[in-house]
Amino acid sequence: MPREQGVRVVARNRRATHDYTIGDTWEAGLVLQGTEVKSLRAGKATLTDAFAQVDERGEVWMYNLHIPEYAFGTWRNHDVMRKRKLLLNKREIAKLSREADGPGKTIVPLQLYFKDGYAKVEIAVGTGKRDWDKRQAIRERDAKREAQRALANRVRNRKR
């Protein structure tokens, strides 16, 4: 059976950009069991509460990544909320660990996808936003939308 080509997104973490200011991003492989891969290929995963940590041995683990049980799995189905190991180079792990050590910083997954047949997760170091940061972002987005609307109306009125 030939390996699938390209990128197919399984899940996105839209809350991450709302709750965190996103810094550098990395692509990491996932260590998965067979039924987890089958469940992901069916498009079932939730990244909402997921986060990653670097342990004392220098390994990166993903927590709270919800991959539901495979519907046609038998008694050998996987644990839904188990911690999953992320595959990164030693240099990448060291840089990720240095960046995530600061106060208020955490490693958050942005999206989960298949790339050339392998399950990958895009992770980033995020700094938690406070409520006033979120309100300010909403104000900026609304102002930008109003400016675009005014520009579109001006262009529309010129054509008449």
From Swiss-Prot:
Keyword Cytoplasm found: yes
An annotated GO BP: trans-translation
Positions of the UniProt region annotated as Disordered: 139-160
GO cellular component, one term: cytosol
GO MF annotation list: RNA binding
Biased composition (Basic and acidic residues): 139-148
Highest taxon of the lineage: Bacteria
Membrane-spanning parts: none
Subcellular location(s) of the protein: Cytoplasm
Major localization listed first in the record, in broad terms: cytoplasm
Record's keyword terms, sorted: Cytoplasm, RNA-binding
HAMAP family with a match to the protein in the record: SmpB (MF_00023)
Family per record: Belongs to the SmpB family.
Function of the protein: Required for rescue of stalled ribosomes mediated by trans-translation. Binds to transfer-messenger RNA (tmRNA), required for stable association of tmRNA with ribosomes. tmRNA and SmpB together mimic tRNA shape, replacing the anticodon stem-loop with SmpB. tmRNA is encoded by the ssrA gene; the 2 termini fold to resemble tRNA(Ala) and it encodes a 'tag peptide', a short internal open reading frame. During trans-translation Ala-aminoacylated tmRNA acts like a tRNA, entering the A-site of stalled ribosomes, displacing the stalled mRNA.
Name this protein carries in UniProt: SsrA-binding protein
Organism, scientific name: Cutibacterium acnes (strain DSM 16379 / KPA171202)
Gene giving rise to this polypeptide: smpB
